[in-house]
Amino acid sequence: MLINYIMDIIEFKDCSYENKHLVGGKCSSLGELYHLSQKLNFHIADGFAITTHLYDSFINQNNLQDIIENTLEQIDYNNIKNIEDNSKMLIDKISNGTFSESQQQSIAVFYNKLCEKYNIVDLDVAIRSSAIAEDLPNASFAGQQDTYLNVKGIENVLENVKLCFASLFNTRALSYRHSQNIAIEEVKISVAVQKMVRSDIGSAGVAFSLDPESGYNKAIVINSAFGLGELVVSGGVKPDEVICNKATLKDIEADPIIMKKMGDKSSKIVYSH
């Protein structure tokens, strides 16, 4: 599918690995998952990507590019207080920036369209970071930027999108990029706006297409716990773990499960209405 590459917002159905430079790693994967869901008839929570093009425009129209570059050049990465102070300054500058009228209208149109799809006024959404430098071969950016859950109403969506933009410069992200010698020019951020799902009656987790500890690429590793996935991602709970053999997944007579290990799952995070 041909995409207009100057678009500020792209729905999940039009996201793919082909426009990863616009929508980042997470949104491109969500787009691929959306396409797969249409073929195999399963559901995913729908949404849209606010692209790196809109992020660039936001930074430039608020005259922040020079401030960002000058600040990054003078950070003392051997001084944690210095990193924190400069991080806070950049986060404050970005979160206090303003969207143009056309940007606000564009985001509102797609948010309202999502509300209409699910027939819910002021639909609860997750505001999720999707950086273009996510999961490089020699580096992983999982958890570096921020995610905001259960965001309701267009004004709150706009504010949390700015916070997501700003999280590109939080202390852990700055320190990690410096340790990996990744220049800021290599990193931009897209933002996923995605419908929230029920967490009180379900579970969440992560799946890896290889063993993240050993690098063994013939296995799939799945970790899952009750409620939202935050505790799994942050290591705050011991999840269930299942390891599958890729070679036997398509053999209906074979058991693909190599190992199952039950975690204590001692707590869960749910949305308190």
Question: Which residue ranges define each predicted feature?
Answer:
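Phosphate/diphosphate-binding loops
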Residues: 195, 199-207
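Conserved catalytic alpha/beta cores of large enzymes that bind or transform nucleotide phosphates
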Residues: 219-273
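Short conserved micro-motifs at the rims of enzyme active sites and ligand-binding pockets
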Residues: 138-140, 204-205, 231-235
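Short beta-strand-to-turn element immediately C-terminal to the catalytic PLP-Schiff-base lysine
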Residues: 148-152, 207-210, 243-245
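Glycine-rich phosphate/pyrophosphate-binding beta-alpha loops
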Residues: 202, 209-212, 223-230
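N-terminal beta-alpha lobe that positions the nucleotide/phosphoryl donor
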Residues: 2-192
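Short beta-strand segments
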Residues: 128, 194, 221-223
